[in-house]
């Protein structure tokens, strides 16, 4: 649970009954896991689990800002424990450990625990200058109580190092050892770190002052089962193409955001790029700039599911199941080898044939792309510079905005993204319609899945495929400054 921290060396400790002893810095997170578990009111249990047996573990703590207390912990089956009493709600307990590894004693970094918050933490983040509150609204209308609505927040608060959020808003580095720590999750005989909390534990949390690649999973009736790599450098999200994935029978959805106080403006969005689990809304507010915008879906889940089934073509109906509607790019049906792998291929062929005999010209945002297809490639210029080449895409390339549409130079990728949007929206053969939203999804073939979510999204906005932000059609919300929002409110529907 600790991650790869820089650890200070404490050389002289007054250990209980041991006089003084030299201590060296602790090793990496692979050495141990630790935490604090709330018990009765005013009481908490500090625990420490070394990866190799220890002859002794001492805990040192500063309760309520008072004097240091030092205790030899009790070994309970390999997990060392110490109960602390007399903690007032909201008070902070600072603690650290000294432990044996068959040689010099090792000392851990200092951690903090807020009484009444659930567990202790070794990570950064939480409230402070540049932070803002993230509030969760349970709009499931009694279908799921707050104790059944789970939140899992993951992101990089330190570049290159993934962390997860605890109920008090502090961030802790992910660790594969959490899979064997007290309170870990188990499903189908496999253990997972418990990185989720419920709305009954925290209905609002402070955002880290910086987070890259932030993802807020919301799951109903179950926490998320997320494995962590053995080197603690990555984690595994739900695999929608794997029926054996532990989250395949879990109702979940998510919100994405990135924010670095003073450097990178807040940008976040609800998304259906990979799937729809249940309706979510996001309200982003910033009083200083007057920004106040809400995006997402306000229909009930039953309405979304029934309207989807009635609206899309036959090829897209099998994407719907009890737990979710899977996006074409995340379904084996629409990928190579699937029954719908060629769903858009005739349209792609016709478009490439059209631009063999007709000049391709796209002018947007002060830039002009001009070219013609020869063989399987579109050779083009941008504002007269070039030439550049865009290979003919496949249907799986289009639904995933990948392959030929995401290859080559930046300029080639730029036009590839434009073609991806045009193919999905059904306007590829008329560049005059590429930036005309009223023309989107009005002809076939097209991406029925993406088109449907644009019909039900607030202001017709949705993130239905990876480049759905082209021509500002997505649900993304971006501030025009790098100051913190006043608030982010996520509505959880059903």
Predicted region positions:
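Secretory targeting and sorting signals
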Residues: 1-26
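Short, flexible coil/linker segments at or flanking structured domains
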Residues: 3-9, 36, 47, 81, ...
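Intrinsically disordered, low-complexity regions enriched in Ser/Pro/Gly/Gln/His and often acidic
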Residues: 11, 73-74, 427
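Glycan-association/targeting regions that enable binding to alpha-glucans and other polysaccharides
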Residues: 24-126
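Extracellular low-complexity, O-glycosylation-prone Ser/Thr/Pro/Gly-rich "stalks"
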Residues: 70, 93-111, 116-494
């Amino acid at each position: 649970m600790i991650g790869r921290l820089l650890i200070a060396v404490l050389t002289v400790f007054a250990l209980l009954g041991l006089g003084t002893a030299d201590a060296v810095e602790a090793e990496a997170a692979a050495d141990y896991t630790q935490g604090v578990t709330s018990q009765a009111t005013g009481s908490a249990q500090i625990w420490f689990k070394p990866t190799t047996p220890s002859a002794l573990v001492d805990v040192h703590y500063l309760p309520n800002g008072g004097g240091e207390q030092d205790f030899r912990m009790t070994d309970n089956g390999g997990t060392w424990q110490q109960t602390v009493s007399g903690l007032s709600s909201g008070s902070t307990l600072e603690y650290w450990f000294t432990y044996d590894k068959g040689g010099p004693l090792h000392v851990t970094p200092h951690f903090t625990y807020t009484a009444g918050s659930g567990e202790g933490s070794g990570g950064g983040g939480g409230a402070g200058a540049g932070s803002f509150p993230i509030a969760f609204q349970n709009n499931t209308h009694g279908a799921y109580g707050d104790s059944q609505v789970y939140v899992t927040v993951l992101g990089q608060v330190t570049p290159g190092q993934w962390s997860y959020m605890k109920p008090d808003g502090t961030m802790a580095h992910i660790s594969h050892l959490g899979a064997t720590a007290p309170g870990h999750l188990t499903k189908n005989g496999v253990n997972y770190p418990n990185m989720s909390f419920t709305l009954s534990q925290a209905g609002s949390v402070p955002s880290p002052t910086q987070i890259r690649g932030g993802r807020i999973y919301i799951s109903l009736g179950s926490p998320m089962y997320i494995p962590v790599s053995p080197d603690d450098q990555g984690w595994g999200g739900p695999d929608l193409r794997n029926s054996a994935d532990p989250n395949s029978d879990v109702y979940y959805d998510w919100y994405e955001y990135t924010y670095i106080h003073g450097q990178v403006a807040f940008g976040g969005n609800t998304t259906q790029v990979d799937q729809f689990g249940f309706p979510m809304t996001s309200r982003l507010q910033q009083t200083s700039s007057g920004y106040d915008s809400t995006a997402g879906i306000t229909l009930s889940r039953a309405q979304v599911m029934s309207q989807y089934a009635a609206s899309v073509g036959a090829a897209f109906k099998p994407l719907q199941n009890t737990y979710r509607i899977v996006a074409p790019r995340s379904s084996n049906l629409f990928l190579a080898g699937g029954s719908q792998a060629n769903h858009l291929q005739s349209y792609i062929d016709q478009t490439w044939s059209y631009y063999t005999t007709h000049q391709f010209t796209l002018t947007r945002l002060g830039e002009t792309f001009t070219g013609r297809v020869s063989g399987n490639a579109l050779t083009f210029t941008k504002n007269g510079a070039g030439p550049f080449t865009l290979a003919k895409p496949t249907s799986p390339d289009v639904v995933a905005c990948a392959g030929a549409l995401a290859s080559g130079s930046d300029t080639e990728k730029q036009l590839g993204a434009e073609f991806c949007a045009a193919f999905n929206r059904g306007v590829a053969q008329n560049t005059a319609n590429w930036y005309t939203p009223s023309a989107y999804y009005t002809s076939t073939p097209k991406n029925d899945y993406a088109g449907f979510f644009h019909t039900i999204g607030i202001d017709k906005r949705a993130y239905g495929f990876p480049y759905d932000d082209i021509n500002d059609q997505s649900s993304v919300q971006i501030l025009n400054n790098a100051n913190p929002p006043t608030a982010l409110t996520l509505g959880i529907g059903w």
